[in-house]
From Swiss-Prot:
GO terms for cellular component: cytosolic large ribosomal subunit. It comes from Sulfolobus acidocaldarius (strain ATCC 33909 / DSM 639 / JCM 8929 / NBRC 15157 / NCIMB 11770). This is Large ribosomal subunit protein uL6. It holds the Pfam family Ribosomal_L6. SUPFAM superfamilies: Ribosomal protein L6 (SSF56053). This protein binds to the 23S rRNA, and is important in its secondary structure. It is located near the subunit interface in the base of the L7/L12 stalk, and near the tRNA binding site of the peptidyltransferase center. It comes from the Archaea. The keyword Protein biosynthesis does not apply.
Amino acid sequence: MKCLKAAYIREEIQIPDKVKVSLENNVLKVKGPKGEVIKDFSYAKGIRIQLNEGKIILETTFADRRKKALLYSIIAHIKNMITGTINGYRYYLKVISTHFPISVKVSGDEVQVSNLIGEKNIRRAKILPGVKVTVKGEDIVVEGSDIYNVAQTAANIESSTKIVGYDRRIFSDGIYIYKKEVIGLEQSD
């Protein structure tokens, strides 16, 4: 069966009052109370992005499966940008040490992990721009307005403590992501 193309697809995203949005050469800037997120959509060939009367309008013509998927992915990115600038995103990580006490500290634009399974060298994880990392005992909190930078920073911290050559069932030492949330939309447990 042949896949039919949609002749015309138009989707609108309402811009909240707290948010300022600007568009220039397919570079979308969303600014809100929690910060500013900039994303370049110039890779999206065949998809037109416009600002009109408090709405972001996305249009495409003769959309096949790939173009539709790209359109709705861009919509999800824009909604994440708006949510991030209004509320922000937060990731929680836990320091697990069974054999040697792990020491974690933030230094400039990196997180330094020392004494992981007794290693003398310091493992480093890069903190991406616009992300704040705080260490409180065995808990690490990563927060910011850009979900992609927050998630990548948390992943950098987690992967910097990956142990190779040991049985993971016994040597469970490391730093692990255990919770993700939108700030202000916390759920009571």
